[in-house]
Amino acid sequence: MPIFRYALGLLVLTLAGAAAAHAGPKAAIFPFELIDVSLEGEHAGQQADETARLQLATEELRTLAAREAGYEVLDLSGLAAEIESTGPFHKCGGCEIDIARKAGAEIAITGAVRKISSLILVVQILVRDVASGKVNKVHRVELRGNTDETWLRGVRRLVSSHAGGG
């Protein structure tokens, strides 16, 4: 019986080590931001449906980054107040790095949706190395249409491009 327990213990340790060895980088994924340069945005400001789409896109990015790109996506909810007060990240030149470091991340991913008009949008993600603060990759896709489905399609294309090394 002691040999069985020993063998079982070794198996558990081996499997745990193998799982840890295959875990991807720890990623701090920050909420998408809207950069609205459209005439509509100038007059009406950010719309409730676009605010909801930002959250939808962020959740989709987090899900796909773990599932498709193999990242260990970190929970940033404990840093929500700091994230809110620090942004917008698309203007700060890497200010998200300190927050990502606090979360224990190896990479920081920020995203932005630039709304040019009701029909033309550009979705972008920027991936930074937390240790150096340098930008590793920038991925962007153009969208035609301002709907939940087009935003989700854009995020999926970004992750597919990133996971494929493109």
Question: How would you describe each model-predicted region?
Answer:
Residues 9, 39-42, 75-78:
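A short alpha-helix capping/helix-coil boundary motif
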Residues 44, 48-52, 145, 149:
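Charge-dense, low-complexity intrinsically disordered segments
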Residues 6-17:
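Bacterial N-terminal signal peptides
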Residues 48-79:
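N-terminal, post-signal-peptide region of Sec/Tat-exported proteins
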Residues 39-45, 85-86:
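Short acidic, glycine/proline-rich loop/turn micro-motifs
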Residues 67-110:
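Short, solvent-exposed, polar/charged sequence segments at loop or secondary-structure edges
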Residues 22-39, 56-59, 67-69, 94-102, ...:
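C-terminal/domain-edge helix-coil "capping" segments
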Residues 1-5:
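Positively charged n-region of N-terminal signal peptides that target proteins for export
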